[in-house]
């Protein structure tokens, strides 16, 4: 990370030179005289109530208490116009942030009573959806992800058209964040910015431990449904996805877990928070997501609200993230530490080679032979120019039926019947 940061300075210096060359002037923002006055009034009248609300550990109860204070403030300033009311609410948000940040920097317990380094209570379950090929329910505090894994044939890969041409994605991850998971209502629609971004992060975190497609030729789809969210649902998805893949029998090289780190900084004073809540993300300075295995990091993403952090903060954040990741992996390994065998109802696949001069015979005139094999067995049979045959069935029985027919074709007189497509 520090090496990359050092290398970036060359580009940053060039950008600064370009800015000076162009002569872009900074925007001048008029000083707001009213918001500081409202802040002083709210601090005097409502600080104790806000501070008390932020000692409530349960998110729903805490939100209700804070909303009660908000309504009381709006009632007090009900005679103000819309612009002034907005400034009052801005002062209220600033006061919320000041109270939470001051408490943490002074060494007081965090909102839910934890110290800086404690991970919330964990619950790990696998095989929770009987008809799914693999599934897991991962819960960390008030954040929960229900993750399902589905295995399919190579033909089911997602076809993508990019500037580089056509390509196929054999590993898909869909992250769903319904409104109800944060106690809201909303119209179910297509994926939004959050779902696309969090899904991509979770996908990057696992790609490094997936088997090569040549060794495990399945198309894999992961769906993560966030059923409850209070901080870092994307990292819950990382943990649940790793578990569901191993539950499905996907031979990962190592389990992967993720954690979100936060930061409260005031001048030279700072505190790094492990496993942040939603409020700590909202009121703090950083949301630093770190995912990886026992051996190292597989994905990083940092959202930051201040100008930057120094090496000391980065070092402490990564060190604390590693400790938390090891703790989570230990809990995950207690439930499932290595991939299971493929379930009996999981798709079955086998690859083998034949002589190239046999390819035409296996396909048959107009594809008659290979179509006949697929119709009789219910399996999918693919053959490429190198002579590699892939047989894929919804279950072991269908795959074996196709294999038996292929073997029979070239060891008995039944071959003529199949070649004619009868």
Enumerate the language-model features and the residues they cover.
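Flexible hinge/switch segments at interdomain interfaces of large molecular machines
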Residues: 40-44, 174-181, 213-217, 291-296, ...
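Conserved small/polar residues in nucleotide/adenosyl-binding loops
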Residues: 410-418
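Short glycine/threonine-rich beta-strand-turn micro-motifs
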Residues: 385-395
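Glycine-rich, flexible beta-strand/loop modules in the N-terminal catalytic cores of phosphate-handling
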Residues: 128, 133-218, 296-306, 314-315
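Polar interaction faces of repeat-based domains
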Residues: 375-385, 408-409
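Flexible, glycine/charged-enriched surface loops at secondary-structure junctions
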Residues: 11-29, 60-61, 80-88, 105-116, ...
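Mobile "lid/hinge" segments at catalytic clefts and subdomain interfaces of large enzymes
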Residues: 1-45, 248-338
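Extended amphipathic alpha-helical scaffolds
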Residues: 27-167, 347-361, 369, 376-377
């Amino acid at each position: 990370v520090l090496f990359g940061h050092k290398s970036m300075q060359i580009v940053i210096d060039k950008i600064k030179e370009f800015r000076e060359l162009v002569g872009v002037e900074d925007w001048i923002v008029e000083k707001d005289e009213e918001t500081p006055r409202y802040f002083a009034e709210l601090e005097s009248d409502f600080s104790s109530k806000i501070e008390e609300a932020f000692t409530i550990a349960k998110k729903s109860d805490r939100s209700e208490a804070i909303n009660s204070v908000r309504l009381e403030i709006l009632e007090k300033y009900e005679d103000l116009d819309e612009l002034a009311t907005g400034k009052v609410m801005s002062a209220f948000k600033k006061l919320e942030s000041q109270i939470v940040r001051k408490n943490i920097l002074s060494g007081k317990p965090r909102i839910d009573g934890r110290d800086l380094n404690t991970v919330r209570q964990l619950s790990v379950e696998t095989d929770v959806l009987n008809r799914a090929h693999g599934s897991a329910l991962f819960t960390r505090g008030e954040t929960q992800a229900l993750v399902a894994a589905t295995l399919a044939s190579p033909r089911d890969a997602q076809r993508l058209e990019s500037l580089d041409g056509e390509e196929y994605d054999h590993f898909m991850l869909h992250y769903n964040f319904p409104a109800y998971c944060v106690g809201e209502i909303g119209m179910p629609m297509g994926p939004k910015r959050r779902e696309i971004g969090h899904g991509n992060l979770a996908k990057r975190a696992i790609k490094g431990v997936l088997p090569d497609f040549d060794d495990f030729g399945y198309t894999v789809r992961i769906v993560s449904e966030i059923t409850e969210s209070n901080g870092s649902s994307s990292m819950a998805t990382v943990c649940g996805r790793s578990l569901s893949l191993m539950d499905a029998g996907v031979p990962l090289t190592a389990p992967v877990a993720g954690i979100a780190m936060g930061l409260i900084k005031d001048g030279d004073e700072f505190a790094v928070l492990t496993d942040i809540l939603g409020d700590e993300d909202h009121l703090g300075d950083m949301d630093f997501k770190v995912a990886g295995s026992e051996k190292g990091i597989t994905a990083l993403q940092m959202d930051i609200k201040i100008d930057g952090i120094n090496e000391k903060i980065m070092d402490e954040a990564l060190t604390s993230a590693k400790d938390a990741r090891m703790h989570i992996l230990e809990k995950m390994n207690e439930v499932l530490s290595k991939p299971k065998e493929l379930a009996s109802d999981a798709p079955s696949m086998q690859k083998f080679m034949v002589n190239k001069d046999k390819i035409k015979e296996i396909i048959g005139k107009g594809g008659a032979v290979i179509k006949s094999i697929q119709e009789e067995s219910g399996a999918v049979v693919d053959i490429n120019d190198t002579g590699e045959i892939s047989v894929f069935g919804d279950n072991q029985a269908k795959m074996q039926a196709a294999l038996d027919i292929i073997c029979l074709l070239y060891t008995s007189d039944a071959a003529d019947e199949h070649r004619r497509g009868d």
